[in-house]
Amino acid sequence: MEVKATTILAVRRDGKTAVGGDGQVTLGSSVIKHTARKIRKLYKGQVIVGFAGSAADGLALMERLEAKLEEYRGNLLKASVQLAKDWRMDKYLRRLEALLLAVDREHMLLISGNGDIIEPDEPVLAIGSGGDYARAAALALYRNTDLSAREIVEKSLKIASEICIYTNDKFVIEEI
């Protein structure tokens, strides 16, 4: 059975970055969990990572990113590049089905199994089934209001939860 889930959104404004995710996990046509935690702080609280896709795969990739962060002393960009290289070249890792969104004080990155590391033009990034809805809402709020990063994440995730059937309104939000 295919496991679908998640909207993860990151917004940076005025030196603060907020990353939020919903808590829904869907198996087939049933919601099996409402309060899953899909974002974590890594490397002494200096990096926030969220995942979309298979939970086991996402957690495995988070662990590997954490090891790379330790190896590269918290340098998110270098750790992400090395993770993406490993992910693309390793026969086992290539089968993992997840996307990572990782942020620190300087960078906001989408990391994929294709070897992609994408940093957005504007300080708004989203992944997952409701990611496009959350990103559109966040960009509108970012461009047209003075809301904080956290407020933009909250309001945008709420909008995504009203549109995407794989996204609920049980949010976890972390800030750095």
Curated annotation (Swiss-Prot):
A Pfam family of this chain: Proteasome
E.C. code: 3.4.25.2
Catalysis performed (reactions): ATP-dependent cleavage of peptide bonds with broad specificity
Lineage top rank: taxon: Bacteria
Subunit structure: A double ring-shaped homohexamer of HslV is capped on each side by a ring-shaped HslU homohexamer. The assembly of the HslU/HslV complex is dependent on binding of ATP.
Organism expressing this protein natively: Aquifex aeolicus (strain VF5)
Biological process terms in GO annotation: proteolysis involved in protein catabolic process
Annotated SUPFAM superfamilies: N-terminal nucleophile aminohydrolases (Ntn hydrolases)
Role noted for this protein: Protease subunit of a proteasome-like degradation complex believed to be a general protein degrading machinery.
Active site: 6
Activity regulation (record text): Allosterically activated by HslU binding.
Family to which the UniProt record says this protein belongs: Belongs to the peptidase T1B family. HslV subfamily.
Listed name of the protein: ATP-dependent protease subunit HslV
Molecular function, one GO term: metal ion binding
GO CC annotations, alphabetized: cytoplasm; HslUV protease complex; proteasome core complex
Binding site for Na(+): 161, 164, 167
Cell location: Cytoplasm
Signal sequence bounds: none
Keyword vocabulary terms for this entry: Allosteric enzyme, Cytoplasm, Hydrolase, Metal-binding, Protease, Sodium, Threonine protease
